[in-house]
Amino acid sequence: MTSLVSLENVSVSFGQRRVLSDVSLELKPGKILTLLGPNGAGKSTLVRVVLGLVTPDEGVIKRNGKLRIGYVPQKLYLDTTLPLTVNRFLRLRPGTHKEDILPALKRVQAGHLINAPMQKLSGGETQRVLLARALLNRPQLLVLDEPTQGVDVNGQVALYDLIDQLRRELDCGVLMVSHDLHLVMAKTDEVLCLNHHICCSGTPEVVSLHPEFISMFGPRGAEQLGIYRHHHNHRHDLQGRIVLRRGNDRS
């Protein structure tokens, strides 16, 4: 399968500070890669490398031709005094045709929000509008920077269901950054744990049959949510230095 984007041993430094060290990954059509890591681990920098906004000091980046990327940012800052409807917000995107706006909103089950004020949207509604905006250029790759931040569990389940539906319909790759170190989208194909370098990688644990999980999140939540168990052979001290463990640590 041809990669949309591949990174090979990519490193990035800002001044004397090494932010990313020897990071490698592949983003493929129809596949979801979830990136986990603590605050300050370099996740946002890695996203900017994938988007082409940061040039690495070392390593190789390969992109598939004229790759179309749809990006959903971590946060949206709007002037609360500025009257701005969803329709107007989406039309601000360069190259957008007004006849494409409602179909994009309907695709993310948000057609009813077209005339709603942006400032009045809930966290989940805002994420759907941003996702609709990302779909306007018919992306081959969706980059979602913490799409479930500020969204309750039911909203997370609905968003994960929608993301899975979109990747199947569009056959697009998905890079998703998560602020939760353990709870991830169950249908993720690969999970990478980042702390300036790749600490570990794997797949989510199937938990849909666990009675405790079903009772906590319901049948639909158990289907869409998964647990990622880390398997590190090291830890990071307070200065960020790597300290090797005697045996693999799972958490």
From Swiss-Prot:
Annotated ranges, domain ABC transporter: 5-220
Membrane topology: Peripheral membrane protein
Keyword ATP-binding: yes
Reactions performed catalytically: Zn(2+)(out) + ATP(in) + H2O(in) = Zn(2+)(in) + ADP(in) + phosphate(in) + H(+)(in)
Compartments (UniProt record): Cell inner membrane
Subcellular location, principal: membrane
GO cellular component terms attached to this protein's record: ATP-binding cassette (ABC) transporter complex; ATP-binding cassette (ABC) transporter complex, substrate-binding subunit-containing; membrane
SUBUNIT field: The complex is composed of two ATP-binding proteins (ZnuC), two transmembrane proteins (ZnuB) and a solute-binding protein (ZnuA).
Family per similarity comment: Belongs to the ABC transporter superfamily. Zinc importer (TC 3.A.1.15.5) family.
UniProt name for this protein: Zinc import ATP-binding protein ZnuC
Native species: Escherichia coli (strain K12)
Taxon lineage: Bacteria, Pseudomonadati, Pseudomonadota, Gammaproteobacteria, Enterobacterales
